Amino acid sequence: MFSIKILLAIILDLFLGDPSCYPHPVRCIGLAINRWEKFYRPRVAQPFWAGVLTVCSVLTLVILTLAVFFTLLAIFPPIVTDFAAVLLLYTTVAIKDLKKESMAVYRALIQGEDLPKTRKLLARIVGRDTENLDRPAIIRATVETVGENLADGIIAPLFWAVALSIFAPLLGVKAIVLASVGAMSYKAINTMDSMLGYKNERYILFGRAAARLDDWANWLPARCTALGIVAISFMAGYNGPQAWKIFKRDRYQHTSPNAGHPEAALAGALNIRLCGPSVYFGNIVEKPYIGNALRAIEPDDIRQANRIVLFTTFLLSLLFLLFRFVLTGL
């Protein structure tokens, strides 16, 4: 039954995505991060410790809010709690939105839209400066963000959902409830990294705790994602041997300790080269190339990357659930 609920959350995201009218929990987390930052910055002299307190306060607030929420739901029939937990879990994965935003760039490219418009579409999903990117660089940046977001926007929340659910019998909590708490706590960590984890003067110290915690939370999911991409490459007609080769060779050729793993596997699977120098906030960041340019990169690589995302999501979800069943028998 637990497996069905997890798969239901994935299917809900595939069909619904994140409707703009929906009061998305991650937006609430973002507001909390801003509030705690404004609270601690003027009160704590050292920026690093102000950042640590912000991280602890946000996580505590998220967990306590969920605890109160599910405690209140206990007065209703159990199916209400299950439904609420599935809905919360569904909001933590981003399959449809990742596809929607990246495929908007793809369509602009194949329809011959002017580059300024295409760059604006790309800017919605990447952190780098897009104003001067040419056509190949736009494609490359889109494929990179698809690979990275597969790991931290889809696989990681599912990983932590299933991982925490294993402890449900020990804590006397329903597995799907603990799964939603695990996924939402991860999203809080990931959102803090997105908002605070910059290496500029304002956040280099304040955001360090958020960035390090996010690195830890994504360590295993990123590697699972890369291995999932390699497996799908063999199973779905992509270049499996090259995916494995580039994963082993280039996975640490990245400024992030985790993002290089799925990006390397994806570059190998598609026979393309990713990364290289990029511009962030007006500054050139020298990044090594990942992969071999066995052919020229093309817009269809964006579509193929999204296809790999879908296959990898279902493969790893099933493997996570199988591992849970082996451990718990549930």
Curated annotation (Swiss-Prot):
Transmembrane helix keyword on record: yes
Regions crossing the membrane: 60-80, 153-173, 227-247, 308-328
Superkingdom field: Bacteria
Compartments in which it is found: Cell membrane
Membrane topology recorded in Swiss-Prot or TrEMBL: Multi-pass membrane protein
Pfam families listed in its UniProt record: CobD_Cbib
Pathway, per record: Cofactor biosynthesis; adenosylcobalamin biosynthesis
Cell inner membrane recorded as keyword: no
InterPro entries hit by this protein: Cobalamin_biosynth_CobD/CbiB
GO annotation terms (biological process): cobalamin biosynthetic process
Main subcellular location: membrane
Function: Converts cobyric acid to cobinamide by the addition of aminopropanol on the F carboxylic group.
Stated name of the protein: Cobalamin biosynthesis protein CobD
Organism taxonomic ancestry: Bacteria, Pseudomonadati, Thermodesulfobacteriota, Desulfobulbia, Desulfobulbales
Gene: cobD
